[in-house]
Amino acid sequence: MTANDALTAAPGPETGTSDRRRWMALYVLCCGMLMIVLDATIVNVALPSIKNDLGFSQSNLAWVVNAYLIAFGGLLLLAGRIGDLIGRRRIFLIGLAVFTGASLLCAVSQSQGMLIGARFVQGVGGALASAVILGMIVMMFPEPRQRAKAIGVYSFVASAGATIGLLLGGALT
């Protein structure tokens, strides 16, 4: 086979590979979102155990939830803009790494302050990661029919994650 034959040959499985890669990327994005949604709902169910284990007062216990929500809600729009400027993939990966590291800190927390601080950092990571997911899906799936399927899968995972988190939180506590 000459160089010209290779150039004029029928296209190979590139389109199938590209399509497969897009759906694998969607799988990764959905796993990241599932992690974020699971965490939010598991913590709510686990609050009584957290209160007993770390000796929280009722008023201080609210900060376990509030620290996360303040960071997440406060940074969501900014995180989306940062993703537009320096790259959504980069921001997603940074956010996921920050979120995962903060989750580990939450798991090993021995004090109220450490848990509240780790929850704040978790909110930062969650905002970074989740702010760019839909933008990435829109860019990866430009064809309307495929985009609708991808957003449907993403929406299902996010919704199911909330339900699974409540059940899992109850089972773990």
What are these regions (language model features)?
Residues 2-173:
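Transmembrane-helix bundle of Major Facilitator Superfamily
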